[in-house]
Amino acid sequence: MSVESFTPTALQFTHGAAHKVKSLVDEEGNDRLKLRVFVTGGGCSGFQYGFTFDEDVADDDTIVEREGVSLVVDPMSFQYLAGAEVDYQEGLEGSRFVIKNPNATTTCGCGSSFSI
C-alpha cells in the first residue's frame, strides 16, 4: 500500500479583485478589513457564493494575500473553492466580485449559484 500526499490547489485572487478590495478598504478607512468569501446552501443550483468584509480571522481560515489586501475563506467553503479564481468585473449589467470555479458542474445565470 502506498501513501499519497495531497496539496490543495490554491485559490486565486486576481489583480482586479485585489485592487477593488484595496479601494473599498481605503474608502472605509479600516485597514483591518479583509474580503471573506463563503459558500452557503441555497440559490437555484444548490450552493451560492457570498462576499462580506470581516476584521476577524479564525485559526483555521485560509488567507490569500495580494497587493497588500487579504481574502479569507473558512474551511467548509474552501473545499468547494479550491482551484477557483476570485475576480472583479465591471460591465453593462453592473460591477461585482465573481468566482470562476472549476469544481462547479452547473451554474446559474445569476453567476452566484452553482452545483457540484
From Swiss-Prot:
The UniProt note on the cofactor reads as follows: Binds 1 iron-sulfur cluster per subunit.
PROSITE patterns named among the record's database cross-references: HESB (PS01152)
Q: What keywords are assigned to this protein?
A: Iron, Iron-sulfur, Metal-binding
Residues binding iron-sulfur cluster are C44, C108, C110
Q: Extract the coiled-coil ranges from the record.
A: none
Q: Name one GO biological process term.
A: iron-sulfur cluster assembly
Which co-factors does it depend on?
Answer: iron-sulfur cluster
For this UniProt entry, the molecular function terms from Gene Ontology, in alphabetical order, are: 2 iron, 2 sulfur cluster binding; 4 iron, 4 sulfur cluster binding; iron ion binding
The highest taxon in the source lineage is Bacteria
* HAMAP family recorded: Fe_S_insert_ErpA
Q: Which family does it belong to?
A: Belongs to the HesB/IscA family.
Could you tell me what this protein is called? Answer: Iron-sulfur cluster insertion protein ErpA
